[in-house]
Amino acid sequence: MEKVFYVTTPIYYVNAEPHLGHAYTTVVADFLARWHRLDGYRTFFLTGTDEHGETVYRAAQAAGEDPKAFVDRVSGRFKRAWDLLGIAYDDFIRTTEERHKKVVQLVLKKVYEAGDIYYGEYEGLYCVSCERFYTEKELVEGLCPIHGRPVERRKEGNYFFRMEKYRPWLQEYIQENPDLIRPEGYRNEVLAMLAEPIGDLSISRPKSRVPWGIPLPWDENHVTYVWFDALLNYVSALDYPEGEAYRTFWPHAWHLIGKDILKPHAVFWPTMLKAAGIPMYRHLNVGGFLLGPDGRKMSKTLGNVVDPFALLEKYGRDALRYYLLREIPYGQDTPVSEEALRTRYEADLADDLGNLVQRTRAMLFRFAEGRIPEPVAGEELAEGTGLAGRLRPLVRELKFHVALEEAMAYVKALNRYINEKKPWELFKKEPEEARAVLYRVVEGLRIASILLTPAMPDKMAELRRALGLKEEVRLEEAERWGLAEPRPIPEEAPVLFPKKEAKVEAKPKEEAWIGIEDFAKVELRVAEVLAAEKHPNADRLLVLRLSLGNEERTVVSGIAKWYRPEELVGKKVVLVANLKPAKLRGIESQGMILAAQEGEALALVTVEGEVPPGAVVK
């Protein structure tokens, strides 16, 4: 039976430039599409741009442009952005295309003739940026919950879709299909929405106010509400209702979205599908927000926006793709920063993977006449053939960061193997065994390169070229040992991941004296480590349980590189006890422990003697 996979991004609204949130969702979709193609699935990957609506119309007016010229220009920027990121989509749909307009009007007519659309008046609180009405309860301090902007009170005649009619059905469907909306927290959020009336959905705007949109097929004086229009892209791109692509791919649809558009995709879209007689999608996969380095939602006003294209230019697209997939647990709000990217780049890509390839090439020339040696049994490295089987469910469960961690753990095992076997010494006494060691490392790198291809397609093709391996690969080839064929390797190969030096601007030294009253504000106390464990969502962090004598605290600390959890228990450390609590990757840290650091060396500040937990440090 043919394996089929269909993945979509949201179609991006063209009122602004592509940003890191757009890039992340699109990289995840591209990773999933590449993984499934590699695994033999017939795959279709859809992205595109959402080009109608009041916000776009206003943006075009502000730019002094015709709306069509405006959307053509901005949509082109998204296409160029995805080219820069190496996004291999199968189709890029635009809602201004005739093929999309035809499907929107067909579905509208079908739902209207079934009696599920009626004309009425609506008065409510409207956010122009969202192009949505909100209830008083949904606002945050009177502002739009997504954009934080004032809403407008509006009253006008619109056509309405009988969405409330389908609420009981949707409630039951979600309860009977527990993996429909993922991760589970978002499923629970949607069920909470559906626990009370959701009302009917306004699906039109008067053409006199918003002329930029798809006209209703029965009333030319109204254009289609942007969400009713945009959501239908997922089937219009498949040539709904008669297209072969629709019949093949729609039953296997995975939507990827950000949590800010959960309600339209989890409530509006399913009820629209039900009313139109279209089967439900397979999965709705909801991503969290990308936060600035300060842990707050990115905002130009706060000055904490990370520019993906500046990072791409500096580190290369595959490094950026790897960082986003490896660092961010899908569905969670996660801080991103250039510093974190640089750390991940240097540790995983330059030091572990890139350096291993360079060392292996050098030893092949030195000890194997510049050739891949004859195949040999894999010994412990043959365990790598089981990795693909372990990674498949992780990818299907959206645990990309864990899948990549496992793949890179194998690369680390290859490094350990070559260091332990020391082929440079072995060659003096047992040259054949030295060549066998090198074959095993080359074969291990072949397996690792296949597993890492969906994340870093260009660099993994480069890796295979550098080692004389065939470039075209399939996932099943990572499940077999001994496929690296004896052959010469290229004499020249670029460094896969050159070291990146952090640029530090020289600043004039300034005196920064503080008074005793400033220092007195910091409350330092002795704390005893009762327990320590690895952070479930970050391999650089440890979670410590500390005793201050009369109370216990949880502290998250970035010391996992230097300390194992078990060696911390019983130590007396110095805690900044009056630091405001902060969430670090989902766990609240109630203070900070002190450490001294110089370069790569780090040591905790500890207290000797009989000083009890809770004692003040002066």
Curated annotation (Swiss-Prot):
A motif ('HIGH' region) lies at residues 12-22. Its EC number is 6.1.1.10. GO terms for biological process: methionyl-tRNA aminoacylation. The gene is metG. A motif ('KMSKS' region) lies at residues 297-301. Keywords: Aminoacyl-tRNA synthetase, ATP-binding, Cytoplasm, Ligase, Metal-binding, Nucleotide-binding, Protein biosynthesis, RNA-binding, tRNA-binding, Zinc. It catalyses: tRNA(Met) + L-methionine + ATP = L-methionyl-tRNA(Met) + AMP + diphosphate. Signal peptide: none annotated. Residues 518-618 form the tRNA-binding domain. GO terms for cellular component: cytoplasm. Zn(2+) binds at residues 127, 130, 144, 147. It comes from the Bacteria. Binds 1 zinc ion per subunit. SUPFAM superfamilies: Anticodon-binding domain of a subclass of class I aminoacyl-tRNA synthetases, Nucleic acid-binding proteins, Nucleotidylyl transferase. InterPro entries: Anticodon_Met, Met-tRNA-synth_bsu_C, Met-tRNA_synth, Met-tRNA_synth_2, Methionyl/Leucyl_tRNA_Synth, MetRS_core, NA-bd_OB-fold, Rossmann-like_a/b/a_fold. ATP binds at residue 300. Its cofactor is Zn(2+). It is found in: Cytoplasm. This is Methionine--tRNA ligase. Gene3D superfamilies: 2.170.220.10, HUPs, Isoleucyl-tRNA Synthetase, Domain 1, Nucleic acid-binding proteins. It comes from Thermus thermophilus (strain ATCC 27634 / DSM 579 / HB8). GO terms for molecular function: ATP binding; metal ion binding; methionine-tRNA ligase activity; tRNA binding. Is required not only for elongation of protein synthesis but also for the initiation of all mRNA translation through initiator tRNA(fMet) aminoacylation. Belongs to the class-I aminoacyl-tRNA synthetase family. MetG type 2A subfamily.
